[in-house]
Swiss-Prot record:
Official protein name in the record: Large ribosomal subunit protein uL22
CDD domains (alphabetical): Ribosomal_L22
GO terms of biological process kind: translation
Organism: Idiomarina loihiensis (strain ATCC BAA-735 / DSM 15497 / L2-TR)
Family label: Belongs to the universal ribosomal protein uL22 family.
Superkingdom of origin organism: Bacteria
Record-linked InterPro entries: Ribosomal_uL22 (IPR001063), Ribosomal_uL22_bac/chlpt-type (IPR005727), Ribosomal_uL22_bac/org-type (IPR047867), Ribosomal_uL22_CS (IPR018260), Ribosomal_uL22_sf (IPR036394)
Quaternary structure and interacting proteins, as annotated: Part of the 50S ribosomal subunit.
GO MF term list: rRNA binding; structural constituent of ribosome
A GO CC term assigned to this protein in UniProt: cytosolic large ribosomal subunit
Keywords: Ribonucleoprotein, Ribosomal protein, RNA-binding, rRNA-binding
UniProt keyword RNA-binding present: yes
Pfam families: Ribosomal_L22
Amino acid sequence: MEAIAKHQFARVSAQKGRLVADQIRGLPVEKALDILAYSPKAAAGLIKKVLESAIANAEHNEGADIDELKVSRVFLDEGPTMKRIKPRAKGRADRIFKRTSHITVVVSDS
C-alpha cells in the first residue's frame, strides 16, 4: 500500500531541497518528522508539510497504521524558473533566477 503527496511549484531550488530529501529517504515517518522539525534548512519545512499530507492520505484513503509507515520514496524535480532583472551600475542588468521545484513524497507500509 502506497500513499502519495505532492507540492508543485515550491519556491525552493531542487538542488537545495534534495539535500534535505536525502536525509529522510527510507526512514520510518516518526523519525523523518523529527529530523525535518529540527533541520535549519528552509526546504525542510516544505518537505515536512508534504510528508504530513502523505501520512494523512495513507491513514484516510488506505486505512494504514501510521506506526508502520516508512518514507519509501522522496524526490524533488525541477520546476519552472522565474527570471527577474536586477539593475546594476552604468545601465547594465543582472539576471536573477528564482527557481522552483516539485516535491513528491511516497509513504508505504512495506
